[in-house]
Amino acid sequence: MQHNVLILDFGSQYTQLIARRVRELNIFCEIFPFDKIPTDLSIYKAVILGGSPFSVRSEDALHPDLSEIRGKLPLLAVCYGAQYLAHFSGGEVAASNTREYGRANLTYIKENETFFENVNLNSQVWMSHSDSIKKLPTNGIKLASTQDVENAAYKIEGETTYAIQYHPEVFHSTDGKQMLENFLVKIAQVPQNFTPNAFVSDMVAELKEKLQDDKVVLGLSGGVDSTVAAVLLHQAIGKNLYCIFVNNGLLRKNEFQSVLDQYKGMGLNVKGVDAGDRFLSELAGISDPETKRKTIGRVFIEVFDDESKIIENVKWLAQGTIYPDVIESVSVKGPSATIKSHHNVGGLPDYMKLQIVEPLRMLFKDEVRRVGATLGIDAELLGRHPFPGPGLSIRILGDITPEKVQILQDVDAVFINGLKEHGLYDKVWQAGAILLPVNSVGVMGDERTYEKVVALRAVESTDGMTADWVHLPYEFLMKISNDIINKVKGVNRVVYDISSKPPATIEWE
């Protein structure tokens, strides 16, 4: 695959959004840590430097080696990147009189600049910095200003180097995508050839070449990612793909058999393994979220390994890993830190001695769905909401018991079926219920009750990197609340989670 654009990560919360905006232009891009620049740059057509929570003026400033990039490849420096180029190339960066966060407008744009084609004066941009460029670097030419930031954008004469102090990737920068397109397509002349059809064609060919006649084993989860990965691999190697669908006892109500039947109907070579009792036994008494995740991961590997050994001469383990999994799980030296262990990355024990193949690891969730549609996968299956690998275990706060799982499965079924019946399911990116570790007082009939509280969660998102809570109709929430309390024994109170990501995560654990 042609890696057309290289994005260097300095720890900004917005780095992944840069990648999303670039992908929306049908341009492939990849994120690398600032201190792990690929040695072979011949496959890249342009480079983007991201933002950072660090200051270029501090002792712990992050220093990329741009010796093979600067002046040799088209370069766009965003925020910290723009300040870095200025500070270490003859310019001056100083602390701003006031910290500049939020909306601003371009009050000056240099005429006849390709970077600002189809961008009007007063275009809104998003600022997020506490330093400002007081003096441009050597050969710097000012391209744009805001009311408070004189050098909001500049270029370096004699180079294809551009720099901006705002964030074009953020939604609030109304012409940000246009600026990225101007830089990548018109200035850097990057081809716009990263499409679902092209990906399928390239990946199937790549898998055929890599796997040859080797046997591959894949753990199916019922979700979109592993399903699309399975169909891609099936197209490439056919009967040499062996799929295992493990029931960990923490799936949605009646999901194991219905999904297993779907897989068989798609022609996949799949075996269903019901290990629910084993998982629940191992989880008994565990309340800590990380311990839950790791226990589920360990038991899954044990079950999966037992089943894999039945298949002779397996050489590869396939996984449905996607790009946000990789981004959230990799700790980058300096700016980044792992928030929580991710259920789709890592955990493979050495004794399995299988090589890893991850056909989707460079795709965002919405791209996976488009690839699935290209592969002809049923729209209903592709439209399934994301569901965490640890299943309902991380939606049961506190310890896990079969009784709690049953309650949550019933609550979840009422909620999800209600969304479908009211035409709301496809308007929501992800939805589910959370069983809280508290009881509340209620009244049913003439009796006082002291029963469980559940929270409902519904979010809208593109790829799970950020998410907003969905404004479900009050009438719908009222009906679902009543249905849950009336139909699910042991629940007497329902609340609705209105937190966005960030600062909250989509899942509660």
Curated annotation (Swiss-Prot):
One of its GO terms (molecular function) is ATP binding. SUPFAM superfamilies: Adenine nucleotide alpha hydrolases-like, Class I glutamine amidotransferase-like, GMP synthetase C-terminal dimerisation domain. CDD domains: GATase1_GMP_Synthase, GMP_synthase_C. It holds the Pfam family NAD_synthase. This is GMP synthase [glutamine-hydrolyzing]. Keywords: ATP-binding, Glutamine amidotransferase, GMP biosynthesis, Ligase, Nucleotide-binding, Purine biosynthesis. The keyword Ligase applies. The active site is at 79 (nucleophile), 167, 169. Its EC number is 6.3.5.2.
